[in-house]
A protein has these predicted regions:
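Alpha/beta-hydrolase active-site loop
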Residues: 187-211
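Catalytic active-site module of serine/aspartate enzymes centered on a nucleophile-bearing elbow/loop
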Residues: 428-469
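Bacterial Sec-dependent N-terminal signal peptides
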Residues: 12-54
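N-terminal cap/lid segment of alpha/beta-hydrolase-fold proteins
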Residues: 68-122
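Alpha/beta-hydrolase
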Residues: 267-411
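Short, surface-exposed "cap/lid" segments of acyl-processing enzymes
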Residues: 115-171
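Alpha/beta-hydrolase fold nucleophile elbow
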Residues: 212-226
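Conserved loop-alpha-helix segment in the C-terminal half of the alpha/beta-hydrolase fold
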Residues: 403-441
Length: 469
């Protein structure tokens, strides 16, 4: 997801592991990484996680001491939860230290059926989910856990788990930075490469745990939503340059996101977006405030009050514009949710998602995001400079399901896929037939709309099953 330009302008101006027992992990004289990864963090964290979860271990975990030493930190699990979600599905949640800094922490999630307490059911399919801007794993893929107005159990992660998929996912470190933080110097270098590195670490840990518990060592299908899809594309680009055994991804689902474009309007929109961040970043402001929670709260509690975010609109109008307006540019049709418009083209109601559901979704947004991440992917899309994240797209050979929405980024996603080297690319652009792209099924409908399971998730599941390793 992107942050509407009107919001950005105002806010930026204001700112100017033992495996099968509890014995110590084995460190051999000549350590070797787990097959498929040379990441010492993965083996160390997998070893610790097996103790905490009591998952049955069938393949001993060997900690790669030499690789671990190169990380310059002692990786560890900071917190762990096991959360039953109903229907025999359980959510395992970890916060994992992956670096020496106080904020070098990722979230790792697993949503899966159980056959008994702490006994994950064996599955033939697995997927790893990467969220986009402004949201974390639960807010995007388990939205019912953050809303009293969503149907119980509603979310892509639970849908797939109920269909016998082993679902994993990540919280990027910026989602875990608490509100009220004042010193953001740690965010200075949190750009697209940092996202790539943390995503690959999360996937390596997931694969190490799957191997240790008898699920095999297959690489994973990766779904990247919105800017998470940017991270996904950049990860595929990165993995073309590492040995095959160290790659994590074997298939990719970019969910309503473009990576490259030949559309001048898209170039202008993302170049302008980058220009909003450049002055503040140069002045030492490395965080971008996320207005989701403020907009949702004011729309719920004071709908007719004057908006402090978009002057001239009420709080409710701001939330509606945020949902259904052309938030990128007037010549770009992208919007978040399908809606209804008045005679002037201004949104007056939501078409598929309810207003209380939308307010809940907004209020569950994270407070901050890293400016450099925005700037890096804006540069890739707008062809600014020579970023390294798109240099090897023609070498990407994995199968791809390009899953888009008619009212979101779907129409703009096709060009980028033509730059890939894969001969297995499927396109599915979802629409509901409103007759107007500006009121169509859109970017966030993909994960919130009641029609999403039928229109998007079931076709995704079919593709996933067709691409079993």
């Amino acid at each position: 997801m992107r942050i509407p330009k009107a919001f950005l302008s105002v806010l930026l101006l204001i700112l100017c592991i033992n495996g099968c027992s509890q014995d110590p992990p084995t460190i051999p004289d000549d350590p070797q990484a787990l097959t498929g990864t040379n990441d010492g963090i993965a083996s160390a964290i997998a070893s610790e996680a097996l103790v905490l979860t009591t998952w049955e271990c069938v393949e001993p975990v060997t900690v790669d001491a030499s690789a671990l030493a190169k990380t310059g930190c002692v990786p560890r699990i900071v917190s762990y939860d096991r959360l039953p979600l109903g229907g025999g599905i359980v959510h395992y949640r970890f916060h994992i230290r992956v670096g020496a800094g106080s904020h070098d922490i990722i979230g790792l999630h697993r949503v899966i059926k159980e056959t008994g307490h702490c006994k994950p059911a064996k599955t033939k399919d697995a997927i790893f989910l990467q969220h986009g801007d402004a949201k974390d794993f639960e807010g995007m893929f388990l939205p019912f856990t953050r809303s009293t107005h969503m149907p119980d159990g509603f979310g892509l992660a639970t849908y797939l788990a109920a269909s016998d998929v082993d679902v994993w996912g990540i919280d990027q470190p910026w989602t875990l930075v608490p509100s009220g933080t004042t010193d953001f110097t740690f965010m200075k270098d949190w750009g697209l490469q940092r996202n790539i590195d943390d995503l690959r670490t999360g996937m390596a840990i997931a694969r190490a745990l799957r191997l240790a518990t008898g699920f095999g060592n297959d690489k994973l299908i990766l779904l990247g939503y919105s800017s998470g899809g940017m991270t996904g594309y950049a990860t595929l680009n990165h993995e073309t340059q590492v040995p095959t055994r160290e790659r994590q991804v074997r298939g990719f689902i970019p969910a309503d996101i473009l990576f490259k474009s030949n559309d001048p309007a898209i170039h202008r929109a993302f170049a302008y977006d980058r220009s909003l961040y450049e002055p503040s970043y140069a002045a030492g402001v490395y965080q971008a405030p996320i207005p989701f929670a403020l907009v949702g709260s004011l729309a719920r509690t004071d709908p007719s009050g004057d908006s402090p975010v978009i002057p001239g609109l009420t709080n409710l109008q701001t939330a509606l514009y945020f949902a259904c307006g052309q938030i990128f540019a007037s010549d770009v049709s992208i919007h978040y949710l399908a809606g209804y418009m008045d005679a002037t083209g201004f949104p007056i109601d939501l078409r598929l998602v309810t207003l209380p559901q939308w307010f809940d979704f907004l209020e569950a947004g994270v407070p901050y995001q890293a400016c450099k991440f925005f700037m890096d992917y804006d540069a890739v899309i707008a062809d600014i400079g020579d970023p390294p994240f798109d240099d090897h797209l023609s070498e990407v050979r994995v199968p791809v399901l390009n899953l888009g929405t008619k009212g979101g980024l779907g129409p703009y996603t096709l060009y980028g896929t033509t730059l890939l080297g894969s001969n297995d690319i499927t396109h599915r652009i979802i629409e509901i037939g409103t007759g107007d792209v500006l009121t169509e099924f859109a970017h966030i409908d993909l994960f919130l709309a009641p029609q999403a399971p039928t229109l998007a998730w079931q076709p995704m599941l079919t593709w996933l099953r067709a691409h079993r390793n």
